[in-house]
Amino acid sequence: MSRLFDSRLADIIRKPVITEKATNALDLNQYTFEVDHRAAKPQIKAAIEALFDVKVIGINTMNPPRRTRRVGKFSGKRSQIKKAIVRLAEGDKIQLFPES
């Protein structure tokens, strides 16, 4: 990895997506993250493997359309997001919730 990419690792992964569908996918060892919309699959894979110390065996990405929002008479668009569904090797796990 180049030094430029090393400094960007934490910027590629924005946050985990916690929805009912994403929570059900945890049983299949699949984790859903919101990522930078310019990131490619190899960059996402390298970032997940480096940040969480796991082995990624597959990535599916999606670019949902931007939604239009209105505030009074002004119309605008929300920022572009990209979601990545990451499938981990058997036995690997990412701790999303703190254990109690």
From Swiss-Prot:
Taxonomic source organism: Prochlorococcus marinus subsp. pastoris (strain CCMP1986 / NIES-2087 / MED4)
UniProt keyword annotations, A-Z: Ribonucleoprotein, Ribosomal protein, RNA-binding, rRNA-binding
Subunit text: Part of the 50S ribosomal subunit. Contacts protein L29, and trigger factor when it is bound to the ribosome.
InterPro entries: Nucleotide-bd_a/b_plait_sf, Ribosomal_uL23-like, Ribosomal_uL23/eL15/eS24_sf, Ribosomal_uL23_CS
Protein's recorded name: Large ribosomal subunit protein uL23
Function text: One of the early assembly proteins it binds 23S rRNA. One of the proteins that surrounds the polypeptide exit tunnel on the outside of the ribosome. Forms the main docking site for trigger factor binding to the ribosome.
Family: Belongs to the universal ribosomal protein uL23 family.
SUPFAM superfamilies named in the record: Ribosomal proteins S24e, L23 and L15e
PANTHER family to which the protein is assigned, alphabetical: 60S RIBOSOMAL PROTEIN L23A
Membrane-crossing segments per the record: none
Gene Ontology MF terms: rRNA binding; structural constituent of ribosome
Domain of life of the organism encoding this protein: Bacteria
Any single Gene Ontology cellular-component annotation: ribosome
GO biological process: one example: translation
